[in-house]
């Protein structure tokens, strides 16, 4: 059984690397194999899936889609452009703003919202939009680790360590991931000042985009507020956060479909068409991929592979928590530069628990280090994260082909500075 499980696991990751489209197929097929051969008992399959994480992800996807289509992000960006005429400063602030938005909105959605602003600025000044858009993408990836709802990897970490929304700010009486990420973001400002030192033009003021529907904004703010409030409820059900995200999305969808209001210009006519458009925005493939991975990881745990990998990691680290932590962070940076960080994080979290148990330490430092390396490591290459792929795709549609060298000119220094600061801070607060 162990050989079958190991071969299936390796095959899944090879296919995820080679076949970026239809990524859900390999994990789901492997999960079915695990059940079929008896590695995971059929009667226990549903219990292996973290439904709280899937519900949070699904609900947040839907709410974010409504938020994007309300044109509120464009309005916020327009105000930003009008307030900061200097191109160099504007690009940096736009990247930082993308990071702020990405702390609460999916990274890909953030790029889709703000890339048009960067392109519009570039066209006005007759400069290449490549560097501004890449800066937006890498900044979005950085801040995705800041909060519970910022990125799928954060949701996976929260599910593993049983974290609440506020735990990303203060955990075990110490600063949480949010503050480590902010220090990393501030550390990248000098890097961006140097990268964009030649951009000295100015942008003419533009009319702010009109927002006709403020309900999605209320929904998004309400989701964050409800998650914060739920953090204070003792003994709450395990799927509370999932029900919050799904509940607010469904209520918002019903309101969008049936409440009397002015119809947006880009909106499908009729409640059924409106609901269908919104539901299309939910990435069912990612949900299926995660469900399959949950089953696979449970199977790997049952046959002892997770324990074996944990022992190898501890052995390579020589039993030293600091050396093991260092290997976890920088190996995650390297791996995430070439493979998607979602399946990588999902597979490695149980390994962190096993390695920590072998060394007799709290797994928090290894798990936080994993998130730092896996989330920020995706910024090294154009294929390291979905937001990067989205950004380069947008640029290609505009007629700009982004080479790996062009991307890495921004991605490498940005990543090294951000990871180094996070690496040091996590160890100082959770490892020493």
Enumerate the language-model features and the residues they cover.
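Hydrophobic transmembrane alpha-helices of multi-pass small-molecule transporters
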Residues: 1-67, 173-311, 410-432
